[in-house]
Amino acid sequence: MSNNVEEKILHGTTTVGIKAKDGVVLCADMRASAGYFIANNNTMKIQKIDDHAGLTLAGGVADAQNIVDILRYHSNLHRVEKHGPISIHSLARLCSLIFHQNRGYPFMADILVGGYDAEGPALFNIDMFGSVEKKAYVTTGSGSPVAYGLLEEEYREDLTVEEAKKIALRAVKAAIVRNIGTGDGINIAIMDKDGFRLLTEEQKKAVIEL
């Protein structure tokens, strides 16, 4: 990856994904930046793909939104044709295929796909060239070096969703303190046996204050 392309992906944003024993947590800040200019301070970087799956976005907004639309379409199509939800692994492979087919003119995005299916919780990282990695925990964006420090210190294989969401929030908060491309609030989503749901402001406040 050239330095110029890598800079486009890494500049701004911190997203975090954690796979717990009973679900997946996705967390992201709300700042959209263009260089040193804050373009938007209320950006939703966590998107619902289906009732059981979601993703986080880092990189170019237009490219990332295009990928979200494609994944939603195919996930809905799978429900119609197969009479059931697409697996999280298949969703990640589809995302990989989209990136790989466009590698000549790559989407400037880095995606975390997570969810809960018949096999349990699953979390994947897909980069702009289509590489797929299954993850226990992962962070993307310019604040990721800071967030990784906290994740590596606190992650355990037996984490519950309740514990994971606290760690994810602390990781993004740490990035907000140290990274100028990260800020303006935090969103967090949980995917477990009860499906996809975003935490409300009251629920986030309760976790942050713990």
From Swiss-Prot:
Its Gene Ontology cellular component terms are:
cytosol; proteasome core complex, beta-subunit complex
Listed under catalytic activity are: Cleavage of peptide bonds with very broad specificity
State the organism of origin: Nitrosopumilus maritimus (strain SCM1)
Compartments reported by the entry: Cytoplasm
Q: Name one Pfam family in it.
A: Proteasome
Record-stated family: Belongs to the peptidase T1B family.
**Residue stretches spanning the membrane:** none
Report the domain of life of the source organism: Archaea
Q: Report the protein name in the record.
A: Proteasome subunit beta 2
Regulation (activators, inhibitors) = The formation of the proteasomal ATPase PAN-20S proteasome complex, via the docking of the C-termini of PAN into the intersubunit pockets in the alpha-rings, triggers opening of the gate for substrate entry. Interconversion between the open-gate and close-gate conformations leads to a dynamic regulation of the 20S proteasome proteolysis activity.
Q: How does it assemble?
A: The 20S proteasome core is composed of 14 alpha and 14 beta subunits that assemble into four stacked heptameric rings, resulting in a barrel-shaped structure. The two inner rings, each composed of seven catalytic beta subunits, are sandwiched by two outer rings, each composed of seven alpha subunits. The catalytic chamber with the active sites is on the inside of the barrel. Has a gated structure, the ends of the cylinder being occluded by the N-termini of the alpha-subunits. Is capped at one or both ends by the proteasome regulatory ATPase, PAN.
